[in-house]
């Protein structure tokens, strides 16, 4: 029995199978989860997550400045810094020859 071109021993057309596989794989990826996923809902969730991330970043950035605000008097700190600088200047004058 002569072997026919492009056919397997069982008589299956290899070209036909290749075409079917190519068609199936081309369409399969987009529709595999199509019934399970609402694209609009996912986009909305992604936008909400991005907004929350931005909000959290802003909140933590602002939080650093206000974390100790109730405990620290800026005027008092300036006064202490001025006193420390004055003492430093006095001490450096004593030891110069």
From Swiss-Prot:
Site feature: Cleavage: 32-33, 67-68
Keyword set includes Repeat: yes
Transmembrane regions listed in the UniProt entry: none
Alphabetic keyword roster: Repeat, Sporulation
InterPro entries named among the record's database cross-references: Spore_gamma (IPR006341)
Bias-annotated ranges (Low complexity): 43-63, 79-91
GO terms, biological process: sporulation resulting in formation of a cellular spore
Region (Disordered): 1-97
Chain's role: SASP are proteins degraded in the first minutes of spore germination and provide amino acids for both new protein synthesis and metabolism. These proteins may be involved in dormant spore's high resistance to UV light.
NCBIfam families associated with the record: SASP_gamma
Family designation: Belongs to the gamma-type SASP family.
Protein name in the entry: Small, acid-soluble spore protein gamma-type
Natural source organism: Priestia megaterium
The encoding gene: sasP-B
């Amino acid at each position: 029995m002569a072997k026919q071109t492009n056919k397997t021993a069982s008589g299956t057309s290899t070209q036909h199978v290749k075409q079917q596989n190519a068609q199936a794989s081309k369409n399969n990826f987009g529709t595999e989860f199509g019934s399970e996923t609402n694209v609009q809902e996912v986009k909305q969730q992604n936008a909400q997550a991005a907004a929350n991330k931005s909000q959290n970043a802003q909140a933590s950035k602002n939080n650093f400045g206000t974390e100790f605000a109730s405990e620290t008097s800026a005027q008092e700190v300036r006064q202490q810094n001025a006193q420390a600088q004055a003492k430093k200047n006095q001490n450096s004058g004593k030891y110069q020859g």
